[in-house]
Design a protein with these regions (language model features):
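Aromatic pocket-lining residues of Rossmann-like dinucleotide-binding sites
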Residues: 24
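Phosphate-bearing ligand-interacting subdomains
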Residues: 42-131, 135-137, 156
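Short beta-strand element of Class I
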Residues: 30-32, 99
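Internal, active-site/partner-interface "lid" segment
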Residues: 129-130, 140-159
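Conserved acidic E/D residue at the C-terminus of a beta-strand in Rossmann-like folds
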Residues: 34-36, 103
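Cytosolic Rossmann-like ligand/nucleotide-binding regulatory domains
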Residues: 3, 7, 11, 34, ...
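N-terminal Rossmann-fold NAD(P) dinucleotide-binding loop
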Residues: 17-18
């Protein structure tokens, strides 16, 4: 069954925001990108449904731009913590259904959570944990933390186990490991 197309507003088109916006558009979603920097906006015009110059700290400007009509909004404003906080608050006031906000540190994370962001992400810390896991064990090809102590790990099968039936291996009984296809 094909996935329903959703609409996303990405506020802040720096490295992180533009990457998210481009990927969401590549997946077939309707994406508006917004930033104060005209150069960042103009680079996104050919790739997104819409790209606009917008001050996300201005609630009226966000309403006029129709940001309230998007299913999900991502506040990807990087260095300006005040602007990030105001943008998150404005999205909540506008009634945007789902709000993700990028934080620069733990305190910023707490503030965005208290303002009602549905998900607050710390990209550098999350990528740092991901990289450490993969560097720690060279057999790990990819790693996704699911939270609450659960992870999905793609590993290289050791040569000595190649060709063995999974049922013949004593995997999981003492380490709480589950094999996925």
């Amino acid at each position: 069954m094909p996935k329903e197309t959703r609409s996303f507003a990405v506020l802040g088109l720096g490295g992180f925001g533009s990457t998210v916006a481009l990927e969401l558009a590549r997946f077939g979603n309707r994406v508006i990108g917004a930033d104060l920097d005209e150069r960042k906006v103009s680079r996104m015009v050919p790739h997104l449904h819409s790209a606009i110059i917008l001050d996300a700290t201005d609630e009226a400007a966000m309403r006029e731009a129709g940001i309230d009509r998007y299913d999900v909004a991502l506040v990807a404003i990087g260095r300006d913590i005040k602007a990030s906080i105001l943008a998150t608050m404005n999205l909540r006031l506008l009634g945007v259904g789902t709000i993700w906000s990028k934080a620069s540190d733990r305190t910023h994370h707490r503030i965005l959570s208290k303002l009602g962001a549905d998900r607050v992400i710390l990209p550098e810390q999350e990528m740092g944990r991901h990289s450490a896991q993969m560097l720690h064990n060279p057999a790990v090809q990819d790693y996704v933390s699911l939270g609450n102590g659960f992870s999905v790990v793609n590993i290289i099968v050791p040569e000595k186990l190649d060709g063995e039936a999974v049922s013949a291996l004593a995997i999981g009984s003492e380490n709480d490991i589950r094999l996925l296809g």
